[in-house]
């Protein structure tokens, strides 16, 4: 019957020794105590587990092949993408392969940036790095990346990056995680708007 099928799936899936240890090690999220007096713990959903794991594998592959393409994950609204990014960030920071990487969390709206910044800044112990900073200007972004040799997690918006921006860093272990990345790659057609001051032409970010 169905209840027993679900129980069997959980026992064979979650409680397989190697997988259970993997979940226990990387997929139980908790905020720093000063930000969460109740010390609530959040355990991953199965899509978050497999997404974060496969993304890490894909990022490793992209470094080996020097493709610069770490992968794409599509998650519906409310599926917990911010926690998936948190699980992934923790695994990347702990990975010996990446040798203490620097991670950029990029969004396309300030409200998303504020939301992620609050969550990530309050999770330094879980992430495993004391430098978790929200970037509010291009100059600060440049200073932080050019002056850093390892580690650090930075939250910023896609608007901070422009074609005339100088080389920020040539390190191979800087990893970008972009939330809602598709929105900067669509609606590329020119939009014309007539205003009191004249004609305005706008394009999608990727134009």
Residue ranges: model-predicted function:
Residues 112, 121, 145-151, 159, ...:
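A long, glycine-enriched binding/interface module in the latter
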Residues 162-207:
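Signature of the SF2 helicase/ATPase Hel1-core->accessory helical subdomain module
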